[in-house]
Amino acid sequence: GEKVIALDARKYFGYEAEHIPSAINIPHREMTIESTKHLDATVLYVTYCDGIGCNASTKGALNMTRLGFKVKELIGGIEWWKFDGYATEGINGKQTGLKFECAC
């Protein structure tokens, strides 16, 4: 299977507070050739941010694509990650998500 890495496109304080397990953090405004030179270009990066109302993941996906990386965007961000019942890490990390059930 293809290797996938979650990429938190928010500022560091958001990542530090709570993030997807094993995610890396590069704020979208700081994505440059220099700040991404250590990344593996063969990996698929999935950008995310806070969720609805935040566009850091969209901007991050655009920046990473322009830098030559394979990218997808996690629609709904970390909030929908938690709504789907997944755990988070960080200062406010939770072992399980909210298990919110929607009709979609």
Each model region followed by its residue ranges:
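Periplasmic peptidoglycan-binding/tethering modules of Gram-negative envelope proteins
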Residues: 1
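Rhodanese-like catalytic fold shared by cysteine-dependent sulfurtransferases
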Residues: 4, 16-44, 51-104
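Structural scaffold elements adjacent to functional motifs in cytosolic proteins
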Residues: 6-8
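Histidine/lysine/aspartate-rich catalytic loop segments that bind and position anionic ligands
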Residues: 12
